[in-house]
Amino acid sequence: MCIRDRYYAETVIKKSLDKLYNLAQGGTAVGSGVNSPRGFDKKFIQHLKKISKLPFKTASNKYEALASHDVFIEVMSGIEILTSSLFKMANDIRVLASGPRSGIAELILPANEPGSSIMPGKINPTQCEALSMVCAHVIGLKNSITFACTQGHFQLNVYNPLIIHNTLDSINLISDALISFDKNCLKGIRANKAKIKELLNNSLMLVTPLTKVIGYDLASKVALNAYNKDISLKQSCMELTNLSEADFEKYTNPKNMV
């Protein structure tokens, strides 16, 4: 469920952090440093590093640091990758937990609330829905940051408050949502082993590895025959091919496909 996307997002975010530490203090109005005491920028950075314990540094080009805040687009792009991955994960879990009898129902979600106000006993995927809404909101915040970063007219971009506010808001929202999702959903999820086994054994797609044994055309006939007659893939294979039961079990064993 997009685990590698999560690590990719983490890589993008970490790489962009180094650029965030470049500060324009000492550049005064447009980056020239006019009227700034000599050495102010370095002393400011030293003091900030001391109280924050973070590796801040003075920007090598203060003109660029004041006029452009593109680094925030880079940071938010990493966060947007994370939100996209989380949105997919939440949606996958929600669909896999659909049911309990008319859906996929491979997952059993923890009951965080009494249930539906309309349908008694119905367990709503509220944590999945909450996380997906947070992701949608953060993607919107990222778009507003992108627009704000276009407003660097000549030597100065005065949209800093919007950029900083939405960046921090995005980080806080995603952090809180992840903590809640982990606590109230992930840690309580259970696999519905009986349902998983039922769906796995009834899956017509297990015919796929048989193509290298009986050929694509015959494998297609086996799958369609099983579907049209509402019989198992194994029964259909026994009807239409010379494959033994042992060989069928051997080639269609899901463990060999993991």
Could you tell me what each predicted segment is?
Residues M1-I3:
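Short, small-residue-biased leader/transition segments that mark boundaries at the very start
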Residues R6, I13, V75, I79-L82, ...:
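Amphipathic alpha-helical coiled-coil segments
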Residues A9, S16, L82-S85, L96, ...:
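Heptad-repeat coiled-coil/leucine-zipper interface motif in alpha-helices
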Residues E10-A24, K42, Q46:
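Glycine-rich phosphate/diphosphate-binding loop of Rossmann-like nucleotide-binding domains
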Residues K15, K19-N22, V95, S102, ...:
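Heptad-repeat coiled-coil alpha-helices
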Residues L17-P37:
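FAD-binding core of FAD-dependent oxidoreductases
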Residues V30-S116:
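Acidic, glycine-rich loop-and-beta core segments that form the ion-binding/anion-interacting portion
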Residues E64, S68, N91, S98-V258:
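Catalytic-core signal marking the mid-to-C-terminal active-site face
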